[in-house]
Amino acid sequence: MSSKYPRSVRCCLPLCALTLEAALILLFYFFTHYDASLEDQKGLVASYQVGQDLTVMAAIGFGFLTSSFRRHSWSSVAFNLFMLALGVQWAILLDGFLSQFPPGKVVITLFSIRLATTSALSVLISAGAVLGYVNLVQLVVMVLVEVTALGTMRMVISNIFNTDYHMNMMHFYLFTAYFGVTVAWCLPKPLPDVKEDKDQIATIPSLSAMLGALFLWMFWPSFNSALLRSPIERKNAVFNTYYALAVSVVTAISGSSLAHPQGKISMTYVHSAVLAGGVAVGTSCHLIPSPWLAMVLGLVAGLISIGGAKCGPGCCNRVLGIPDSSVMHYNFSLLGLLGEIIYIVLVVRHTVWNGNGMIGFQVLLSMGELSLAIAIALTSGLLTGLLLNLKIWKAPHVAKYSDDQVFWKFPHLAVGF
């Protein structure tokens, strides 16, 4: 039987992270330069504010959203920041290299930083399914592989289906969810009694998770509209996302009370479901013609998320063998699928309204994009999960899953624990 003492990453982590950072610095030195044009100076402030919103979402929102576990709050916040910082650097280079052929100098603009931040956000969402089951070295590998897979997916879909940046990135809800769930399926499963103890929600960390949900709730309209070019589409995206999020909050609190035998409200259900509307309208937020439709989507999404939070973890554990403590499948994959279906319906409606007879062709294209995104997510997630199972990463023992003591120094604890 293997030892349950924590496996030290003292040599592995610094060597891996610092070598990778040195390589990134060299790549930036030889292959990047800043945009010297003056064309976008008028919109510089507005563009920077959108990028700032995305950074707040990533660093504070997703960082604190996953910090509700009693014994895994430090790692959730700090590891998310680490993945964000690394993912943005790699995404800027990768997007620049993939967007030009033959490869040349990568021009860094505020838009490219926004695009890279959204790519890094995908890793933070996927990591919600595996945080606590992997160490920081494994997360480094996951960041590199997922950002590369997402960038490749965007390039392939753009070249085959001629889609814009927004549509490419909005497929990422499904991509990140299925990528994260597939990686979690490949990892060693936690011990049942240990998992029950470690997954307990503490009061103070749960408040921190709700704080993260509030930051995400405030800035999600910026995320859904970040890559849209047309001012009218950006305005529609912001409005529709706000309406959907507002209804999600009402549905989350009401549904949480309904799901409890005594009518009590669960903080876990609330901070899972308040964002449901933003996810559901993400793909089609710029096409929704009226507020009531966005509000209906927010209502349906909130109910799906509450149902997933109540029944999902047990179902995923029993049927799929996935320790989905963050309800990844219900909060992102099902809601992302709902958003994709609504997008297809709106595209068909727009095609009929304009008198274009190619309805079947439009549906076929949309289904092709959706299927390709899921296929790439499952394939890359499976390869990543198998890669993370290699012993060279010194993964934590299953008895030490979701435990900050494995990674952090606690002055009041004995040496070696």
UniProtKB/Swiss-Prot annotation:
InterPro entries: Ammonium/urea_transptr (IPR029020), NH4_transpt_AmtB-like_dom (IPR024041), RhesusRHD (IPR002229)
Subcellular location: Membrane
GO biological process: ammonium homeostasis; ammonium transmembrane transport
A single Gene Ontology CC term: plasma membrane
Membrane topology: Multi-pass membrane protein
Record GO terms (molecular function): ammonium channel activity
TM annotation in the entry: 12-32, 44-64, 77-97, 125-145, 172-192, 203-223, 238-258, 265-285, 287-307, 331-351, 358-378
Pfam families: Ammonium_transp (PF00909)
Cystine residue pairs: none
Keyword annotations of the record: Membrane, Transmembrane, Transmembrane helix
Functional summary from the UniProt entry: May be part of an oligomeric complex which is likely to have a transport or channel function in the erythrocyte membrane.
UniProt record similarity statement: Belongs to the ammonium transporter (TC 2.A.49) family. Rh subfamily.
Protein name: RH-like protein IIF
